[in-house]
Amino acid sequence: SFEKKEVLRDIDFTFDEGKIYGLLGRNGAGKTTLFNCLNRDIKTDSGNFYIDTDGVRREVTADDIGYVLSTPTVPEFLTGREFLKFFMDINEKSIKNPKSIDEYFEYMSIEPEDRDKLLKDYSHGMKNKMQMLINIIAQPNILLLDEPLTSLDVVVAEEMKQLLRSLKQNRITIFSTHIMDLALDLCDEIVLLHHGELEVVEKTDLDSKEFKDKIIAALREEGNE
């Protein structure tokens, strides 16, 4: 809650490994707040988050989380290569089966001539790729994506969608958006953040008008409060 306003309440939900969940809600519905609670950036008034690893249930820690922001945050005084080297050096003990820096660049389709440029000279899409790349290297158990495709051009956005589909195994991926068509295109399951609670919207037919109308009605209802 913020200043006595309850943003999230009574959330009791299970996310399964190997799926991309679309967290759909209006702007201001609390999607980023939920992510910040999961990431421990915001302290919850009550409740806990748990994860099952190797058959053992335990509380989620910051080490479990990879967080891709809608506005990429990168150290602009470093080159792309320096940034990756720095990240890999400080996380050396936790990175499983590391590749070479150039292999990672190839994986993200970052051209050789761009790899030694300062990050401040990267486009928004390239900064977003770098932010995504460090989360790929870290291999988190839970990947949170806070509207990361909203301001990307069509080509980069499509590359990122294909990448997310290829990475979804062995982790929980939660993709927040207020754009319904994007959620339907990318995600395996749709979860509606509505009145501060999470609700699964059944996807019996992704193209059905009834399905879309149900989501729109719920979002409109929340907006009229």
What annotation goes with each model-predicted range?
Residues 154-156:
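Helix N-cap at the start of a conserved alpha-helix in ABC-type nucleotide-binding domains
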Residues 143-147:
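Catalytic Walker B motif of ABC-type/P-loop ATPase nucleotide-binding domains
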Residues 39:
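Helix-to-loop junction immediately C-terminal to a conserved catalytic motif
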Residues 24-26:
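The feature captures the beta-strand-to-loop junction immediately N-terminal to the Walker
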Residues 44-61, 200:
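Conserved ABC transporter NBD signature motif
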